[in-house]
C-alpha cells in the first residue's frame, strides 16, 4: 500500500469538517457529495451519536456502505434504516423550527430570496 502524499482540496475540506462534527448534534447535509461524506466520516470517527438529515428530507439514515452520495441520495442503499423519509420542504421546516443544530452546505446556487438550487 502506498502512502498518500498529496490530498485534494475536497479531501482536506471533508476531513476538516469531519473534525467539527459533534456528538449528539443534528446536521443538515445539503448538496450531497462532500457535505455528506464529511458528516459520515465525522460520525464514524469522532461522533457516533451525531445525526443528520439529507437535503431531500431523509432523517437519520444508516447508509449501506459503500455508496456514492451524489448518485444515490434517495436510493435504498443511502437511506437504509432511516427514521423518516420526508421531503425537501419538511427538511427546511425542521430547520426553521430549530430541530437542526448545523447545516453543512456544498457548492450550490442561492438566489436573492434565499432559495437553494442544488440540482446537478
Region locations from a protein language model:
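Conserved alpha/beta enzyme-core scaffold
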Residues: 1-120
Amino acid at each position: 500500500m502506498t502512502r498518500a502524499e498529496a490530498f485534494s482540496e475536497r479531501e482536506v475540506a471533508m476531513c476538516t469538517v469531519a473534525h467539527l462534527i459533534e456528538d449528539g448534534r443534528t446536521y443538515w447535509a445539503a448538496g450531497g457529495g462532500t457535505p455528506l461524506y464529511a458528516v459520515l466520516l465525522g460520525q464514524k470517527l469522532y461522533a457516533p451519536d451525531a445525526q443528520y438529515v439529507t437535503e431531500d428530507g431523509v432523517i437519520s439514515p444508516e447508509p449501506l456502505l459503500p455508496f456514492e452520495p451524489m448518485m444515490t441520495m434517495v436510493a435504498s442503499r443511502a437511506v437504509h434504516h432511516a427514521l423518516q423519509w420526508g421531503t425537501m420542504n419538511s427538511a427546511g421546516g425542521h430547520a426553521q423550527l430549530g430541530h437542526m443544530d448545523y447545516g453543512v452546505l456544498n457548492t450550490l446556487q442561492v438566489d436573492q430570496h434565499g432559495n437553494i438550487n442544488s440540482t446537478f
